[in-house]
Amino acid sequence: MSLRIYNTLSRAVEDFSPLVPGQVRMYVCGMTIYDLCHIGHARMMMAFDVVQRWLKASGYEVRYVRNITDIDDKIIKRAVERGITIRALTDEMIAAMHQDIGALGIEPPTLEPRATEYVPQMLAMIGKLEEKGLAYRGSSGDMNYAVRKFPGYGKLSGKSLDELRAGERVAVLEGKDDPLDFVLWKSAKESEPEDAKWDSAALGHDYGKGRPGWHIECSAMSCQTLGETFDIHGGGADLQFPHHENEIAQSEGANGKPLARFWVHNGFVRVDNEKMSKSLGNFFTIRDVLQKYDAETIRFFIIRAHYRSALNYSDAHLDDARNSLKRLYTALALVAPATVEIDWADPFAARFKAAMDEDFGTPEAIAVLFELAGEVNKTHSAERAGLLKSLGACLGLLQGEPSAYLQAGAGLDDAAIQALITQRADAKKARDFAAADRIRTELLGQGIVLKDSPLGTTWEVQS
């Protein structure tokens, strides 16, 4: 079975084959970096981390570009509030982002372009749009995109122009010929700091001092780093409209070619079945969550839901994820896993692959991991344990030491617990089973569960 991916553009699951055999080019809209990453950002980056891992496991060479928006109204406002330069703020936030996603085990993209490094390319694309009659200078001095002049507008979101015109979300902004038009180049304002302005004349254009609009940033960066047409464009479902719709209008309007063959969007994160927002007090940064839960538990919690489905965040769901992951590690603790190269003809591996090949079906793939763990529990097979670990690696799971995961959070230190386990073993050898049972009960009272196996006794924290 070949890989099939849900394409937002066609609203159907389609067979995937890259433009260049054996090579996949993928662009994902990344962070606007004015604050710390929250759990919604983690969900997006984790979703495409799994996509990247599975494409590589499937034998593809992957060029994965995830951009950084480092110039934006919110960034300017935050830098001014803090009394620092835009560059100082964005450097600080990028370092924090890398620390947070590194803690979650998210593999880095091939390239991570910053918007401010591609302003000449953005201006060049605006120039092409102006030449084709798709861009104009508004009365406010901004360069705007003339939406009604692009015949394919709305094809990604499925929205008609008349529907958008009537919609309450579309504000009539000063200086535009049509309220649907959007800004390509924002003219500079006196009140803005100098490091928020570029002189377009110095770069060969006559649009005055200003800065690029958000949408043109991604069009220019994706074209420059991946070419005019590439395989996969991804991002959160909230970006489908207007951001990705506007990217299509810009890139296809300028280049006359499809921007991306597949459009892939991950679902929203809700908190206790409510939208996550600072105003509701249910807004969680990655750092907040890492104070309560380990990184692998967070990863397991996120990817056991299908990437397109809504993800409901709650402590109860994370607790359940931790307990579920313990079941997998308990199997790996029974026997030292052999080093196994995956044989995709193996029945477990074949079902895992079939699940992942059907639109990155992580829930079904994880179900196979639990079945395989059950096999390890029954057979104590080092080869089966090795396959479990190797398949887990395709999802970024089960690469830690089982004992370290199972014993995390114990009240007693390791040495004290091990001393009691040794005493219990001595009591059993002396056939003093009452003493052995007392030690087991004593440890259980402190939240430590003992597991006996042919390899000896291990322990874990009680769920």
From Swiss-Prot:
EC nos: 6.1.1.16
Textual note on the cofactor: Binds 1 zinc ion per subunit.
Short motif 'HIGH' region, span: 31-41
Binding site for ATP: 278
Molecular-function annotations in GO: ATP binding; cysteine-tRNA ligase activity; zinc ion binding
An annotated GO BP: cysteinyl-tRNA aminoacylation
Membrane-spanning residues: none
GO cellular component: cytosol
Reaction(s) this enzyme catalyzes, per UniProt: tRNA(Cys) + L-cysteine + ATP = L-cysteinyl-tRNA(Cys) + AMP + diphosphate
Subcellular location: Cytoplasm
Chain sites annotated for binding Zn(2+): 29, 218, 243, 247
Record has Cytoplasm as a keyword: yes
Lineage: superkingdom: Bacteria
InterPro entries per the UniProt record, alphabetical: Cys-tRNA-ligase, Cys-tRNA-synt_Ia_DALR, Cys-tRNA/MSH_ligase, CysS_C, Rossmann-like_a/b/a_fold, tRNA-synt_1_cat_dom, tRNAsynth_Ia_anticodon-bd
Positions occupied by motif 'KMSKS' region: 275-279
Keywords noted in UniProt: Aminoacyl-tRNA synthetase, ATP-binding, Cytoplasm, Ligase, Metal-binding, Nucleotide-binding, Protein biosynthesis, Zinc
Pfam families found in the cross-reference section: CysS_C, DALR_2, tRNA-synt_1e
Subunit architecture: Monomer.
Family label: Belongs to the class-I aminoacyl-tRNA synthetase family.
This protein's name: Cysteine--tRNA ligase
Species assigned in the record: Polaromonas naphthalenivorans (strain CJ2)
Top-level taxonomy: Bacteria, Pseudomonadati, Pseudomonadota, Betaproteobacteria, Burkholderiales
